[in-house]
């Protein structure tokens, strides 16, 4: 008997429907075609054990399985459940009437338990788009998939539940989640707050500007000055995720298998902080079986690279294009995969190997050549892509011992949100542009033209610091953000002055770059 069962294959952060055709006939062999990988081919042994452990008999017949479309590689053990159901239905152990209404995915253990899978959310979205009545998946993934409305999502723990449900012997209750309530439940809660930071008012201001315009930022300063402390508090002043951004971010983490068990929707912007020993593939994604990298896992959030010069040159250079394009394209011989990479890059570094160059109290023991080699690990093109470059100095004792509360993240966030609302109105007619950091040269010429005094100041800075054309654009973008924070319609000289001050690594005292 020929039957069809439906599953899904995840490519990038989206899913494709996979049709699994099973035919049982006279014979004793097991054939599987349709570009399955080794894990899918090995499912035969798992399915036999799971089925017979639960009191059912695996057919002693010739079983032919075809997985289409044949040009899409089927990877992983998540096809165990639809394969098992298809084989039993073909052997008339399961009624085939309901099979066309449901999509099934799940990995089987030898005792028939159904184990978690990756990509439950994009699979659920695809099931709804294709008009399936419901989705049957592992119970551990059910809340993740149930955020998709207008789809019955059933979480199951073992194969017996699935067989009895499809045969009409039991009823299963679909898991229902109020997506909006789930989204708003924790999206304003933060454990870290800028009120914990003593002093460093100028650096806090730089973070406010970065958050308001979506600008990349790098902090240069000695050990213990508070670089990491402030970077970790950046998400607390960023605008909250929209529901659409939350779904997109959750899809990426779902595909990567990074969702916590029982979680549903990511309601806060991600903060990723990879170690400096990370490989280029782990950072940008890829591999034999392509997966999102850290830069994609930080999409719609913050990617923090602590001690930037300690990262390998290859890792830093491979990051340049994604920062510009806000996406990662992984090309293979027969297909290509695209992952989003819309991140705010926050980096920190010491000014020299010993850490005390330009320190007000401690003496630097590094030679000028050593300092230049250290700074030379970060290329000019990469620095050009970092809009705000801030030098940070140690906090004096008087500030550390001050018990008066500092400004909270909430009050800073209100100003950031107000500036973002101005930008949202400005770019309403420009799809794909949401904040000042994303402006093209054409938009800069329309929205960020400085006044006469500002233009003169900018010309002086370009000549003095030998800035590139890209750095020129970055200064204008930052100046436009500063003007938005002040509610100014035009870009004025004081906005240009502050923006130029955020190009510390272009200054003469950091050497010619």
Feature-to-residue mapping (PLM):
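Peripheral, non-AAA+ core regions of ATP-driven protein-machinery
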Residues: 1-218, 222-225, 331, 471-472, ...
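Short beta-strand elements
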Residues: 18-24, 283, 387-390
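Basic, amphipathic alpha-helical bundle interface domains used for macromolecular binding and assembly
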Residues: 39-44, 59, 66-76, 289-290, ...
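Residues immediately C-terminal
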Residues: 110, 303-304, 310-311
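Conserved alpha-helical scaffold flanking the Walker A/P-loop in AAA+ ATPase domains
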Residues: 208, 265, 270, 280-303, ...
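Walker A/P-loop
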Residues: 219-260
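The Walker A (P-loop) glycine that initiates the GxxxxGKT/S ATP-binding motif of P-loop NTPases
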Residues: 221, 285, 307
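Walker B catalytic acidic pair
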Residues: 300, 306-307, 318
